[in-house]
Amino acid sequence: MTSTGQDSSTRQRKSRHNPQSPLQDSSATLKRGGKKGAVPHSSPNLAEVKKKGKMKKLSQPAEEDLIVGLQGLDLNSETRVPVGTGLVFDEQLNDFHCLWDDSFPENPERLHAIKEQLILEGLLGRCVSFQARFAEKEELMLVHSLEYIDLMETTQYMNEGELRVLAGTYDSVYLHPNSYSCACLATGSVLRLVDAVMGAEIRNGMAVIRPPGHHAQRSLMDGYCMFNHLAVAARYAQKKHRIQRILIVDWDVHHGQGTQFIFDQDPSVLYFSIHRYEHGRFWPHLKASNWSTTGFGQGQGYTINVPWNQVSFCSHKLSLACFPRGSREMTDYYIAFLCLQVGMRDADYIAAFLHILLPVAFEFQPQLVLVAAGFDALHGDPKGEMSATPAGFAHLTHFLMGLAGGKLILSLEGGYNLHALAKGVSGSLHTLLGDPCPMLESPVAPCASAQTSISCTLEALEPFWEVLERSVEPQDEDEVEGDMLEDEEEEGHWEATALPMDTWPLLQNRTGLVYDERMMSHCNLWDNHHPETPQRILRIMCHLEEVGLAARCLILPARPALDSELLTCHSAEYVERLRATEKMKTRDLHREGANFESIYICPSTFACAQLATGAACRLVEAVLSGEVLNGIAIVRPPGHHAEPDAACGFCFFNSVAVAARHAQVIAGRALRILIVDWDVHHGNGTQHIFEEDPSVLYVSLHRYDRGTFFPMGDEGASSQVGRAAGTGFTVNVPWNGPRMGDADYLATWHRLVLPIAYEFNPELVLISAGFDAAQGDPLGGCQVTPEGYAHLTHLLMGLAGGRIILILEGGYNLTSISESMAACTHSLLGDPPPQLTSLRPPQSGALASISEVIQVHRKYWRSLRLMKMEDKEERSSSRLVIKKLPQSASPVSAKGMTTPKGKVLEAGMRKPTAALPTKESTLGQAKAKTAKALLAQGQSSEQAAKGTTLDLATSKDTVGGATTDQCASVAATENSANQTTSGEEASGETESFGTSPSSNASKQTTGASPLHGAAAQQSPELGLSSTLELSSEAQEVQESEEGLLGEAAGGQDMNSLMLTQGFGDFNTQDVFYAVTPLSWCPHLMAVCPIPAAGLDVSQPCKTCGSVQENWVCLTCYQVYCSRYVNAHMVCHHEASEHPLVLSCVDLSTWCYLCQAYVHHEDLQDVKNAAHQNKFGEGMPHLQ
């Protein structure tokens, strides 16, 4: 996707309409017996008849345009899709080491170990080797200063003493006469891969290099790093290859502060770092490494930090080797580690990618992805003290391969356990080469600490990315405590295992294809225009042959299903009933078809249904036996509506269900099977077959329209979760309207489907691949593109060791289903999914459905518990804050767009275009009240910024070596920062604090403010800093007002002095922030009519008699006091579950279940009545 002027990646978050409450038209409600594909309708009036006639005239050209557009999608790009994985590995990179410390962890043995592992696994011969080259000085100057480069160049001529003195002026580095040349060679190696990837010589690549680079700043060595390879590569790609959007992912266990500082003002580079932090106790001890730092100026929102605050802590038992008397053989020797606390595991990293990185990356749409691939988070690394595995990094690599059209480059950073490092590199390289991801250890669910970090990061980023709207939900304190106890119990018994010896099967045939034209003999004898036409499978197969995909697959012969296979899901009576139709006359066939719902039967129906189901079983056999890795079954009639004893919705035998049972029979056990049903209709038959079976996880995304879309009824509702032992293993995502597209399905994948699927950890994935949600389908009314289906398939391919099977269900636009199945086949064959160039934000209706499902299923799945744990009502207080932006620049919003004067948004709310920063918080502060308002202009990253450096150490042990005495340093630093305001500020004047840049490079570090959401923040690169804070007295006064201004407070009048207190002269140019309520919520139906006695907002609290601040329940109309008085309304809500309440103070409406203010037309009557009672007149805008 290209852009001109203001790029879409720098746009301001746009306001979006919330879903409107649907009109309840009784005439539009169909009974269970309605036909599949039928739409609700009522008798047309004259206007509707005219409109229908006009639309009929326009429909033919529109349909033709759609067909032409779909045909124009060029999926036959075999000759243009780059293939091959590049590898740069040069022995010259081992020509430097620490002259004065042979035990220094960054040493040449790291590359030796990697090379041996790659040779052992045969990976070197599978890669395209590239000769490393030296980076030119002009290329280094794209990021680094000339003075710094010249200084590093002089190290070639220094003796050991001089090198040691210079290295001592930096933090955690050593210098060698060859350090400069090797650093230039390392940077040049990455640049060579950039040229190869962007020039389509290869698809992706890896640079196995040293020294690392992500800590290096513009004019500063740091943390073993001299030049920042990826930063130079990003600027190089932008300059030479005209790249406009680059994603840098840093999964090294240390925060890549150097990369962050280089790009923290730049909206063209999205930087994502996931690292060990321990609340600032871990190197590099910076507040800028915390989740609250999101970038500065136009780059705000483009810096993403996920800080890990939990590490492994193990006790061990040691059994020494000994030689029994008379024996020359050594007895058992082992060291067993029992982890009392587990560091972050694969599940935690995967959760961060699914909930944060992938959604933002799909909205950002990078054109190149660069990875700072450090492997010091692997289990056994002495620096990281984490518990990730090589298989986990293979999955992370697989996720990233779906971005930027597959243009992905990994560049080695850290990793200091030689065996773990080598396995980590080989695991990621296997994935780059297209090998399937290994299965992970169960359960794959994030721990409580990871959930907290991810939730904090999401809340910090939500103001800047539309796709993150409603990404975190409120959670009760009791539920949080229960979840944490559950996590502690599970983790307390977790025993660390040795690194698994992962194997990647090298299959000659990757994708199997089953098709038999005999299935076309099933046809409708009475309606030649029936949507379930024999041409469906023929058109798909022809298209696969035309674009060359069929030739790349292994064609497998179809076979009829055996009775024993059919009987695993269907009753014997039903099978015989269908078999009997083979000999029926035409009139009897018509009568028999009418006995079922939306069914036609012909003499060949039974044989075709038997063949379709048998084809699915044949494909299962091929996948489980290793004959192929994955496959597609182009079959008809479809199957997912078929019940155990009844045909339904064009379906006779449930092919996917029978295939699942057949797989379990082959395995001889209850194989864990994931069934994903993306057909636009709910697969009622599949759900009923497995609803009591915990070995099969059934996930369905479908049009529901509140029970009025086929197959009608409440079976597809989110509340249907399974029964008995299968409770929680049925997941329904009901769409309550049309036009759901790629963004809506991807949001569901990221937030719901993949988290649950990874936690379930299936051994086989079956997809009920109906394509009637595709663009142009006459029944679905949705807008999923072929490219969208390619991405959905790619994301599921990381599961079950890549064992995934697509079985055709519905889809009735012949062009759409052909293009969509071809796109899925591309993904199965390992081709990168195409970029989604016109991805809109998810619809509010889709987000509502997703949130509804999460609320239902979070009790069953730990991976869905990314919730707000602070009191949302307190945090969302209605305090108004005035902020003046710098006069030297036009006001800049969170995404770099101009903010209109007087834009009203709420301080601290979740959807502002320019939110105010808040005081940095930790897990222990999660229940604290709203942080004090703070305006910050950043400090220079090239100065001594003591106020933002949590600790400063210069030994080699500090990189990864957290010390226990640093807690006091952190607390002291934060306390001193909080005490910088003066009494003059308390009186309303504001004093600026500045720090001049240091001339000593050895003291350079970040000064980045940790505060998120401040549009006026500036980059640490800008030099002088100035911080404006509310005085401690003003903060206390403001906190005392929270009871009147938060949650159910409604809002007493705020003294104008409070608006400007602490801001001094910053009140001349005003930008206001206030609460933005929801325009709709799903709980409005709980609002009852006003009682006959009327509404009295002056009533006292029914429990305590208080009249200070009360609320009226809009269900029972009882009056109780606010949580800031005696919290009796909160108690009433918890006891009655009545969701909506009205403030007797300012007549605002709060929904406890949505945890938000709501303003909707359904509330106008009660608000008008309250206004009449309170002020003696109706609301002005209603008169």
Curated annotation (Swiss-Prot):
The modification Omega-N-methylarginine is found at R32. Its cofactor is Zn(2+). Zn(2+) 2 binds at C1101, C1104, C1121, H1128. Zn(2+) 1 binds at C1081, H1083, C1151, C1154. InterPro entries: HDAC_PDAC, His_deacetylse, His_deacetylse_dom, His_deacetylse_dom_sf, Ureohydrolase_dom_sf, Znf_RING/FYVE/PHD, Znf_UBP. A motif (Nuclear export signal) lies at residues 66-75. Residues 980-996, 1021-1035 have a biased composition (Low complexity). Its EC number is 3.5.1.-, 2.3.2.-. Coiled coil: none annotated. Pathway: Protein modification; protein ubiquitination. SMART domains: ZnF_UBP. This is Protein deacetylase HDAC6. It comes from Rattus norvegicus (Rat).
